[in-house]
Design a protein with these regions (language model features):
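Terminal C-lobe "cap" of eukaryotic-type protein kinase domains
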Residues: 98-131
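N-terminal beta-hairpin/loop module of FHA
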Residues: 160-200
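Forkhead-associated
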Residues: 207-235
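Conserved C-lobe activation region of Hanks-type protein kinase-like domains
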Residues: 16-22, 27-96
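Cys/His-rich microdomains that often coordinate metals
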Residues: 138-145, 157-160
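Protein kinase subdomain VIII
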Residues: 1-14
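Short cysteine-rich clusters marking metal-coordination/redox-active sites
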Residues: 133-137, 148-154
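Conserved small/polar residues in nucleotide/adenosyl-binding loops
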Residues: 236-243
Length: 247
């Protein structure tokens, strides 16, 4: 029952798309944080009976990081990985899990509004695109809600790079970062096909640019208000809107 939605555990409902979305959230949480989202100090019983299982996973589940209820927090020395990993992820990742395991979504009146697959796709696509390399050589996350971040490996403070924002997607503008169709085409959610790359100037490495590797023309709006199209010289051009970088 550890992977079942509370209403399935209680026998109130058979599995369907809504209950499957709860199970998906459990699996994703365990992949990232190496522990079950409902197992904290509250569930550390000498003998986990069937009655207690129905309570912890069915009638009265409590997310270990519930911002409104700390009754089931992870235990130091027991849930070590979870305690270490949770604060390392950007706020938008943590908030999505908080929503997925909120009381209302688990057992309240909002069980039909669980986090859908498309939202998870957007969250993890953005997480990938906000991953950059620290000077220590390790990869780390950039939190778009923070002006500065710390490397999750060495702890060094990292100044937030410019961030590209298109629709619900964000991407750190660091040399070598790929831009995908979901970044450069407003009607696309394709997060696999690379359409461009962030590059730095040969003469001034601190000056960044976007290289168009697609078959479309990117239209840039210049500081004076005029526009200019940029097309890869080796490709035929179509037309596509150009996303705008933000600081």
């Amino acid at each position: 029952c550890r992977y079942m939605a509370p209403e399935v555990v209680m026998g109130q409902k058979r599995p369907d798309s809504h209950t499957d979305r709860f199970s998906l959230a459990v699996v994703l949480y365990m992949l990232l944080f190496l522990n079950h989202p409902l197992e904290g100090k509250r569930t550390m019983c000498p003998c986990l009976t069937e009655e207690l299982e129905r309570k912890f996973y069915g009638s009265d589940p409590v997310f270990v990081w519930d911002p409104a209820n700390d009754a089931n927090r992870p235990v130091r020395g027991v849930h070590t990985n979870e305690i270490k990993l949770w604060p390392l992820y950007p706020a938008f990742v943590r908030k999505t899990f908080e929503k997925a395991f909120s009381h209302e979504v688990m057992v309240g009146n909002d069980t039909t509004h669980r986090v859908i697959e498309k939202v998870w796709q957007e969250v993890f696509t953005t997480l990938r695109d906000l991953t950059i390399k620290c000077s220590c050589g390790s990869e780390t996350f950039i939190d778009p809600s923070q002006q500065s971040c710390r490397c999750i490996n060495c702890g060094k403070s990292i100044e937030r790079p410019p961030i590209l924002k298109v629709k619900k997607y964000h991407a750190a503008l660091a040399p070598g970062k790929k831009l995908y169709a979901c970044h450069v085409q407003y009607d696309s959610d394709d997060f696999k096909e690379a359409k461009g790359e962030v590059i730095s100037s040969r003469n001034n490495p601190s000056l960044l640019g976007l290289r168009n590797d697609s078959n479309n023309t990117w239209e840039a709006i210049l500081p004076n208000g005029s526009s200019k199209g940029y097309t890869h010289p080796d490709r035929k051009s179509g037309s596509a809107g150009m996303p705008r970088p933000i600081s």
